[in-house]
């Protein structure tokens, strides 16, 4: 169909401006003039018609361009009229094609349109930004330090790692800066050392884990978020992170805040001080890879799918490891810890009580319930109703199974001895249930089929779940979130979709569609409705996120606030106000100019690149460090605007008008200059480009702040 031809054989490098040029763009024919195609210098078409780019012609002699004809139509219309009519073409596609063709005026206009809703300062939900912390030094050695610790009245050795504070001598305490190659992650791929891997929060505290160290921030009412702790560099990537900021009944004195990190089978625990700093409590071993790490009250819990559970008690400072059935799920409420196992059993642990049997030193782990079909319990959620009597709470447990079933079991406080009773069963999933949440108003389940979500409305009577009329179906939707195959999209534990939020409040899912995305979507967990979307203010990919319920201020009328925390690939941390987003749910946005309105306004000006000349019209240059999209005027418009009908003014009078002499002298000079100077000056004639530009009225070159 098409035959290749050089510029010498095809279109002559020079020709009359009115010469008709025939184009074949993606199989669609266009005809226009050389003048229309070449009025923008150094563009694709100027190079093509000047012979600098070889041409390809079809059988009719038209120049063939292998691009999308639908997108080319508005581009050709812009070349003809200098007006932009997108004609239904998406802005990003139009910008991409304009950049390909080298149409600088159109590129600037489209970039300005994209900047309409984007800002380096975020939107109304943007609440704060924490820059990447300073990388800590690495210890030269990995020698362990042993310190005595009391257990049951006798000293017991507790292994301490190289992360002890530097007050134990000079051996190996100073190290090289971060110049060594980062060790590979468990997936075998190298990790970015400055990437945020995990984020977690508790009350007014935040813990952020990077590849080989972690930092903690504390929110102070007057000064905002303050860095209070930074760990030394570790030897291996951090895979799990846990934080507790309120320990009731602990015996740690001022160290009532703790942060824990797990790497492989090793767990490191630090005590944090409210005013800054921290000290290492110890290093504990589970013996198998840690797959879940969390606090229940003042107990640190670590679990593995192999069936091993480790518990550290803040009061007794005792680390205990117990073997149970292979663990596939867990949940905690109050002081209760529930473990779901692959044999269909649900085990119960009361971690608030002394967790040891005196005769054999085992944890008090008891079987609470067994699934009727003995399917593996792959998701767990426990809900404690408010106390209605002195006998205790009504315990409600929802769990999902490996076969896709969803069951609800309940236990009345007066029938504790008889065990929980099966209350309801749903078989709406055909894939294993991966998440489940039973809250005050909703039952939510998520299965492995691309995060397929099913929700039900829960009916309650006096706080307890009721069968009249029972749970009714509410919504079905998906939270599509693709995972990275090479491990570069962030740690999977740091990209949990949720649901997040208190069980007696609206809960949300956080959706990151692709691993390298810089935009997150916040959706109601009950209906899937979008609450808001946030985009990283610096354009870097989001690698970890979580939702934090922050305590309210002590000021009158304040209330707790909910924040979305996003960790970025460059190490920064951003905060977004979800409380404001939830309050504005359902309200129509009252914005400024729409994209179409902005394009209509831009038709009356011509955007130019930044120029080193001084600003005119009393406008000041933008203080933004990023390159401006526009210029106040070009070099061709440096002619004085104060002269009559474009003629230059006398140099003495011009100097006096620009600031020479006193105020009275300048006023007298204006009077002597004649009445014509008080009229608007006549602009200088529009300079001819010599290329025979299309017959369009001249357009002023303005700065983006001018409109």
Swiss-Prot record:
Protein's UniProt name: SH3KBP1-binding protein 1
Low complexity: compositionally biased ranges: 628-642
Keyword Oxidoreductase found: no
Provenance organism: Homo sapiens (Human)
Domain BTB: 19-88
Positions carrying Phosphoserine: 647, 649
Record field: transmembrane: none
Tissue expression per record: Widely expressed.
Function text: Inhibits CBL-SH3KBP1 complex mediated down-regulation of EGFR signaling by sequestration of SH3KBP1. Binds to SH3KBP1 and prevents its interaction with CBL and inhibits translocation of SH3KBP1 to EGFR containing vesicles upon EGF stimulation.
Heme in keyword set: no
GO-annotated cellular components: lysosome
Top-level taxon: Eukaryota
Each WD repeat, start to end: 185-225, 226-278, 279-318, 319-362, 363-420, 421-466, 467-518, 519-577
Subunit structure, interactors included: Monomer. Interacts with CUL3; interaction is direct and forms a 5:5 heterodecamer. Interacts (via PXXXPR motifs) with SH3KBP1 (via SH3 domains). Directly interacts with cathepsin B/CTSB.
Protein location: Lysosome
Entry's family note: Belongs to the KCTD3 family.
